[in-house]
Amino acid sequence: MPYPVAPMPPRIYITATGIVSAPLDGSGLKPDPLLNGRLSARATVPLMPDEPRLHALARAASEQALAGAPALAGLAADEKGVYVSASKGGMECFDGPPPDLGPGLWRYLSSSPGQAIRARLGWTGPGRNTPLACATGAYSLGLAFEDLRLGRLKAALAGAAEASLTPLIVAAFDNIGALSPARAAGDLRGPFDEQAHGFVMGEAGAALLLESEDGLAMTGHQPLVELLGWACTCDAYHMTSPDPLGTQAARALRLALAQSGVSPQEVAYVNAHGTGTRSGDKAEINVLRGVFGEGAGPRVSSIKGAVGHTLGASGALEAAVTVRALAEGRIPGNRGCVTPLADLADWLALDEEAMAGRVAVSMSMGFGGHNVALVFGKA
């Protein structure tokens, strides 16, 4: 007996976003006395009693995303899932007195932000937490997208948080030469600049509310954009350096476009991973040129020159910014770039500009060679 034919997968929409980060205008880049005067991009977030900072960032972003969605109460608890992750947890354990690791041990796991949100909301549907370094947040969205398309859910809260602005983690990134030595915002060179010399670390929480067509029919929410497709690959090249050719990252982008039914020529904007490291920026340029060609291409920018590199949260944060950019028709500028790398100069949006087109891409590339591409379309 043949297997039953699967129905056409439903379309998936983003109906709300929540962002807790340093200001998107770059004004939050400041010398940090806790980090020996280096620049950092700290977020402002109120803490609840006995709440780890990582949880607070995830909670605040989730509350933003859900603030205008009371109609979700009409969906059954098992029709809603939480896909909020972190690349690491418990960083405060390494910079102070040993915490109580008894019943509170779970709070220091990378999966704990999502667990805390599930418990608070009472959502019992599927949920996954997968730490994949700087691709964590983007991967969380992809997993939620897949489960929604399979009909396992009608709504999902997906995203990530990062709270790693601690002396130990800063020293670790400094030791591998990834951090900018700048101690004043005016000295910082942003992503894709000829003189870029590393990134500034930031922290953030970001959450996106995803709903299937069936979910939308029940909640009545207005979609911001449609999540058309996604893909992930791995370089299998090096633990901290990307493949200089960008072969697998380019494959992820091509696969995501193919799943979305979109040609490269239809992409109006790419929110690049763009960290400001020489090896990372050049590899990503190879990705973009490999997929979009050598002539006219999409507009490109990275927001890390404004908010810092938020590590595991970056994929979710940048996806949320991409969603807002597409919904509002405005491309965020690539802050801190004074002299653009020649191979990308003609595509780079140095300042905010209008977006002409209906499709945008968010790219994430994480340590370990993890690559994720997300493709969004106007709703």
Regions found by a protein language model. Give the residues of each.
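Conserved active-site "lid/cap" helical segment
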Residues: 4, 21-86, 90-91, 252-264
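Condensing-enzyme catalytic core mediating Claisen C-C bond formation in acyl metabolism
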Residues: 9-42, 184-260, 269
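Conserved small-residue
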Residues: 14-16, 34, 62, 82, ...
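Short, well-ordered amphipathic alpha-helical segments that serve as non-catalytic structural scaffolds
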Residues: 57-69, 111-113, 212-213, 245-260, ...
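Active-site-proximal alpha-helical scaffold in enzymes
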Residues: 59-62, 68, 121, 128-162, ...
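Acyl-CoA/ACP chain-elongation machinery
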Residues: 152-176, 183-197, 230-244, 274-281, ...
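Short beta-strand-to-turn element immediately C-terminal to the catalytic PLP-Schiff-base lysine
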Residues: 208-212, 280, 289, 350, ...
